[in-house]
Amino acid sequence: LLIRKATKKDSGAIVSLFNIIIDEMDLDVIKSLDRSKLDIVFQKSFETQEFLTDWAQTTVAVENDKVVGFLYGYSFENEKRINKLMHSFLKDAGLSPSIVIFSDPEAFPNEWYLNSIAVDPEYQGHGIGSKLLETATIVAAKQNKNKLGLNVDWENPRAEALYYSYGFRNVGLIILGDHNYNHLQKNVKK
């Protein structure tokens, strides 16, 4: 298994994994849109240096030349401009620029926020998610953050238990769409 920084060429595979999370979020705005057009928005986003390395950091797990997992996150202070950049691709994809996909703030101040982490279902249970979580801790430290944060859906207690086993603790509640999430944080050594 190879864990490496994502490149533009990985964007299609990343979008497939990102959609696992999007489906679980069950957002009304997503349900109302043409998903193939929305995939264009996501793909264009994950092709930019801003999403890959500059404002956010995207990492992939690769097995036999296939992207089987990814993580994507950013420092709290970059959240608004990342969302704005993603929204700038709506028109290119044939969607109304007035659509707001992600309106709720997700990150907490002074943290590196793990927005997304997903592993291909065929590859789950082999420690790939754990390796990606370890990588997120390293990325947070490199971004000079002493906290790594993430949101976990109340409907996913298995994931929450996994995060607790990695030293995360519940620091708050956040509502995204119609779902309640616990906001978890872990201290990171710089």
What are these regions (language model features)?
Residues 115-124, 150-159, 176-181, 187-189:
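Conserved beta-strand-loop-alpha-helix junction that forms the acyl-donor binding cleft
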Residues 77, 149-152, 164-183:
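Conserved catalytic-core motifs of GNAT/GCN5-like acyltransferases
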Residues 77-112:
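Conserved acyl-donor/pantetheine-binding loop and adjacent beta-alpha core of acyl/acetyltransferases
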Residues 125-139, 161-165:
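Conserved acetyl-CoA-binding loop-helix of GNAT-fold acetyltransferases
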